[in-house]
Amino acid sequence: MPRVIYFDCFSGISGDMALGALLDAGLSLDALREALRRLNVDGWDLNAMREVRGPLAGTRAHVIAPEGHVHRTLDDIRAIISTSSLPAAVIERSMRIFAILAEAEAQVHGTTVDRIHFHEVGALDAIVDIVGVAAGLDLLGVEQVFASPLPLGAGWVRSAHGPLPIPSPATLAILASVGAPITPDETPFELTTPTGAAILAALATFRRPSMRLCAIGYGFGARQMERPNALRVWLGDPDEEEDASRQRGLVLLETNIDDQPAEQIAYATDVLRAAGALDVWCTPILMKKGRPGVQLSALVTADLEDTAVSLLMCETTTLGVRRRTVERHVCDRDIVEIATPLGVARVKRKRWRGELIGAAPEYEDCARIAREHGVPLAAVYQMVMGRLENGATKC
């Protein structure tokens, strides 16, 4: 059965913390080293040490690599990863993380992705961190990744470009690109690094899932702090009754808006989805004095109601929000990864009362493949569905 993992980022996330947490949750260090050797690059090693910090026992992962100013482009890193013998899903996840990092760096520096030269994240230890997380998830059988809101910290951090405010511009750009939820935190250190942010932006949905818990892992960061500088992961199996539990106890929030620009309303819908809303949609309506407007609706679980109402009040011009409890019928669904000659794409399958009745490729995966290889989007959809029908699933 494909597994589910939840990154509980109560003290942020970095690449080495993520590696340590996966190892602490049961990932074999020997198996991870063997997977990373498929990168065909020399000069690194990976150690893992059990530590006790305050009330917590966990694992500190440390990548040993030569220090130095290595400037690699995205194409350089793609070449290292794509020419490896790693599984297709690991290559795909790693590429996705580095692409998000490159896009954020390009945005911050006002240039294009092809002109970006990675500094810290181009170093060998950072490559091992990122590919190691992707390989670790694959070895653990994880197909669905979830994450908590992220604390960022405060103050200043040193970088190859000189001192930068915390959170770093790259970290903020990455989190903004996916509407990731953040939490206020004035700890005077960098809690969420660009690498950690990119891992979650590329792979995670920002909500807590229903799951049957199998293991817990704590990954320690290098810095010693008054509070535990740790990342916690929850590893488990999907709850077979998750969908049934969602049929009851849902809240439908609605508000009418006729005095706000469309792009701001679109942003509000993105923020609601990132916060964990089950569904968000807009309906055109005609309001008083014949003014066109929209009805913004959000379907949320009861425990998310207060958060969603606050977001609606803060992100829109509304003066009030209606609420009502609702029930819904839902199909069982799962996601499989389909390996194609052009890359891996996820497909969502739906079942009704045990019978498979439909499947749909994930648009973002297919669009990325189409852009990278210069082929029509419809052709990618057709290729993915053809591979699915022929049984070319990864799971």
UniProtKB/Swiss-Prot annotation:
Out of the domains of life, which is the source? Answer: Bacteria
Keyword field contains Signal: no
Organism equals Roseiflexus castenholzii (strain DSM 13941 / HLO8)
Q: Which family does it belong to?
A: Belongs to the LarC family.
A GO MF annotation of the entry reads:
nickel cation binding
What is the protein name given in its UniProt record?
Putative nickel insertion protein
The lineage, from the top, is:
Bacteria, Bacillati, Chloroflexota, Chloroflexia, Chloroflexales
Which Pfam families does the protein's record reference?
Answer: Ni_insertion (PF01969)
NCBIfam families linked to this entry: nickel pincer cofactor biosynthesis protein LarC
